[in-house]
Amino acid sequence: GLCLNEIETAICTLDQRMGSIPFGFNLIHNLNEPELEAQTVQLYLRHKIRLISASAFMDLTLPLVYFRVKGIHRDPEGNIICPNKIIAKVSRVEVAKKFLSPPPEKLLGQLVEKKMITQEETNLARYLPMAEDLTAEADSGGHTDNRPALSLLPTMLALRDKLNEKYGYQRSICIGLGGGIATPESAAAAFSMGAAYVLSGS
């Protein structure tokens, strides 16, 4: 991965070149350097990066919840506005469930105690999932859990529907598919199974 200075340089370059075109950055969970993850989130918030792709997370972390919750408010019509969006990339159902659920109360409480978020942000966060959208990562060219797309995507879609009904979110979470999407035929197969989008990397 890039160091913080390199990330900041990339942010400034894209800000100048992209204008009003939206873009996002990656956030990879770093088990060995948790402070680097926190510093990266602070950097993103300072530069008003509103979209991140969260990958390699096995559990939700304080910096990740902080990014999602910071700045939540209601508009004049009473709608909940969440400026910071997370697209989670996961291959395990138990991890997907965490991202498709509201932020954990324990982590929200810690953020309030540290005065990193307000009580109002905490209250509104309970009505939103951690992830705006979620990519089901099947067997891919890089780091992988060797999950078969044919069973992984339908499982994630069913889980999304179950949690949407449980929590009554104001918008449905989009579920995409990544891993092995290398030809037009494989992309078409993903869409025919119900994927909202496809992700093609390596």
Name what the model sees in each region.
Residues 196-202:
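C-terminal, active-site-flanking charged/polar segments
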Residues 174-182:
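Glycine-rich beta-strand-to-loop/alpha-helix junction loops that act as flexible
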Residues 25, 190, 201:
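Conserved, mostly hydrophobic/aromatic
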Residues 184-194:
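C-terminal or late-domain output modules
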Residues 172-173, 194:
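Exposed boundary/loop context
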Residues 1-172, 185:
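Active-site entrance/lid segments in N-terminal catalytic domains of soluble metabolic enzymes
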